[in-house]
């Protein structure tokens, strides 16, 4: 079970950072500036990871469901919600374009509204991502003698996957395949790799 958890979390880390790179390109279109887009992406990721770890972490300690089953459902949710992000961003762009005329908003007010809308769009998938660590940590804590070593190793594997995801996305996949195919490929990692989790939870 521990090896299954490690392998799954490596892939999850890779897919998560693929989304971050692709969403950055999308939000540049919303803000018209990479500076504001990076701020929104980092805020959404940090807020979502914290919220997911807190809420789902508290819940998973009380649920009778197997951690791998919960993890599988979370990953399916990540993949499905991530695929809706481009549609949601496309939907808010006309709204944002109409804001200055409709509200007579200042630059700072308009930027704040853009930021809040972008945060709302990204909060669901990032919160689900945040829930994956406490869920798998529960599984690892039960299979190794040292909780610190088990959870620390799990986190290290996830970060290693994230590094690979950034490098491969930025230098290989995006230039060759484009943003649309890249985000679809990331979702294709989330959903199928959730299936072994669900199967292993029944073993």
Give residue ranges: language-model regions.
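Alpha-helical transmembrane segments of multi-pass membrane proteins
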Residues: 1-203
């Amino acid at each position: 079970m521990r090896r299954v958890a490690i392998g799954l979390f490596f892939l999850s880390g890779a897919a998560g950072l693929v989304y971050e790179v692709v969403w950055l390109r999308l939000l540049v279109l919303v803000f018209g500036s990479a500076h504001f887009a990076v701020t929104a992406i980092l805020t959404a990721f940090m807020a979502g990871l914290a919220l997911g770890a807190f809420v789902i972490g508290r819940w998973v300690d009380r649920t009778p469901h197997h951690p791998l089953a919960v993890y599988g459902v979370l990953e399916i949710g990540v993949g499905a919600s991530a695929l809706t992000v481009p549609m949601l961003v496309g939907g808010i762009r006309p709204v944002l374009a109409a804001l200055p005329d409709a509200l007579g908003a200042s630059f700072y007010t308009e930027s704040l509204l853009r930021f809040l809308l972008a945060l709302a769009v990204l909060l669901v998938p990032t919160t689900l991502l945040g829930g994956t660590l406490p869920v798998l940590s529960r599984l690892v804590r039960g299979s190794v003698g040292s909780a610190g070593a088990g959870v620390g190793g799990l986190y290290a594997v996830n970060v290693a996957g994230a590094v690979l995801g950034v490098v491969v996305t930025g230098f290989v996949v995006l230039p060759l395949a484009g943003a649309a195919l890249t985000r679809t490929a990331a979702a294709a990692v989330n959903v199928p790799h959730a299936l072994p989790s669900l199967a292993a939870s029944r073993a």
